[in-house]
Regions:
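Mobile, glycine- and charge-enriched loop segments
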Residues: 60, 67-116, 189-191, 200-214
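A short, acidic, amphipathic alpha-helical segment used as a generic capping/interface helix at domain edges
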Residues: 9, 122-135, 146-148
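Short coil/turn segments at beta-strand junctions that form active-site/ligand-binding loops
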Residues: 66, 135-137, 159
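C-terminal functional extensions of proteins
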Residues: 149-214
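Gly/Ser/Thr-rich loops at beta-strand to alpha-helix junctions
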Residues: 29-32, 73-77, 140-149, 165-169
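Alpha-helix C-cap/termination motif
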Residues: 17, 133-134, 157
Length: 214
């Protein structure tokens, strides 16, 4: 947000959407005490619970036969990788066959990237509009700071929604620098896994957590 008024609007939206979530995953950092105190009706879990490849019975197996909408910057790569889904997690039911997969290109404003929108909320509204035009049962969202409000929008319009954030790309066998030496994730890599398509980078990606997602 470029000014105090927009920042205040952003914070109020985030508090509202966090308080309305059915389930929140925690990083186990001190400031989360405020989240726990402020979300009376919310259940909490460990962060890894959102990442199905850690578990012998992955929650994502329940996506089988569902119409799934993904909101993520790596649209082209996700669609290509889904075609190789049986090769991504051999012997594990992490990415089952879906009734259909729709991917909406998430707006990327990271690293000072120009989004082409007047402000953050204009970009959010446009992504919500695209979601409303899609036919889906479940939304999986990995769209940076837009993720929580977009997941709430999916829920509020009658759909199931899971905010996987940065880990969304792993569900589709997409490598990222942050996981290259990870003791668990790096061992999931196989020849079917790829880096994001070169068209899906940003000019200042090294400013985004050291280029973690590429």
């Amino acid at each position: 947000p470029p000014d105090d008024a927009t920042l205040d609007k952003f914070c109020r939206l985030y508090v509202k959407t966090a308080q309305s979530a059915e389930l929140l995953a925690l990083w186990n950092v001190g400031a989360e005490r405020e989240v726990i105190r402020g979300c009376d009706a919310t259940r909490f879990t460990e962060l890894r619970a959102l990442e199905p490849y850690y578990h012998t019975r992955p929650w994502s197996a329940a996506l089988a036969g569902k119409r799934v909408l993904v909101v993520h910057p790596f649209r082209r790569t996700i669609l290509a990788q889904y075609e190789k889904r049986t090769q991504l997690f051999p012997g594990k039911d992490v990415l089952p066959e879906l009734a259909c997969l729709t991917v909406i290109q998430a707006v990327q404003g990271l690293g000072g990237q120009d989004t082409g929108y007047a402000d953050w909320f204009d970009a959010l509204t446009e992504m919500e509009r695209r979601m409303d035009a899609a036919d889906y049962d479940v939304a999986i969202v990995g769209a940076g700071a837009y993720s929580l409000p977009l997941a709430a929008h999916a829920r509020d319009t009658g759909h199931a929604a899971i905010q996987m954030s940065g880990a969304t790309q792993l569900l589709f066998g997409i490598k990222g620098k942050r996981w290259d030496d990870h003791p668990v994730i790096s061992k999931l890599y196989n020849p079917a896994w790829v880096r994001p398509d070169e068209t899906e980078g940003i000019s200042n990606k090294e400013k985004v957590e050291g280029g973690s997602y590429w």
